[in-house]
Amino acid sequence: MKGNQLELPPPGNGFFLSSSGGHFSELIYIAKRFKASSNSLILTFNGSDTKVGALEFNIHYIKYVKPRKFLPLLRMMPSIHRLMKNHEFNYIASTGAAIAIIGYLLSKIKRVPFYYVEIIARQTTLSLTAKILKLLGVGKIFVQSSLLQSSHNTYLEHPFNKYRVIKSKAFHVNGARRILVAFGTIQGFNFNRGLDLAKSIMNENDSIEWQVGFMNAGNLPGIKHEQIDRTDFLEAITRADVVICHGGIGVITDCLSSGKIPLVIPRRKSFGEHVDDHQVEIVNFLSEKGLAINLEIKHDRSVINYVLTNKVIH
């Protein structure tokens, strides 16, 4: 540590753990930011959003565990420990969620440093995982919000700070559009409110592709998928004129990386759509930068004009 600040680990072999979705996409970024070697190992949940193509790290999949269900993860700890015996690691790191606690416990057993990085969606409040880790004795963590920076929380700059919006060629806003709707793969939560808000800006001539996850979405116009293979999903984003999504950091990052400004509907705890309101935090943060539009606030056809006449560069 340098003063009160937590320093990045030296380049070497890391053991990285995360759940799926945005936690996983952030984990890949963090592994690269830590300059982890190609012998490093990533452990995550088995799902369409974690089945990436060529990756410079080894990857191991475990069964999906719903948010805040710690006991199933604890039962997996012996098998994860056995997996680690086949590798040499200089440190263990995690971006959450609850699986980070398993990573911390394993770091104590293996006597190696542990690093926790709060995902960028946490802009104003620490996650339950971060709070539990601090209670367990993790003195310092990395955060990606200047609002959370303190003597115990070291700020780690995120690539979002390098994104900016520029004008693009104009489209006729009332024309038919190719629309992709992506609501993630989280299990145990419905998002009918998101379906209704998405449909509110569509017209009958639009070509629509839906990725609805595991909720009961009923009949929808266009093509409906439960999950989309990772490669196909990125191609679908590229094809689309407009992407409507929930406030998952993974899909938002994919949109911005492809130059598109997403129309976002954050999941809210009060509607039973997620465990807390971290999606609201990231959507507010990105909306202030012009990098997203919150469809809760403005949900008519005119929002399409903004995303079609502006693009993201970095």
What is each of the regions a protein language model found here?
Residues 1-314:
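Nucleotide-activated sugar donor-binding and catalytic core shared by glycosyltransferases
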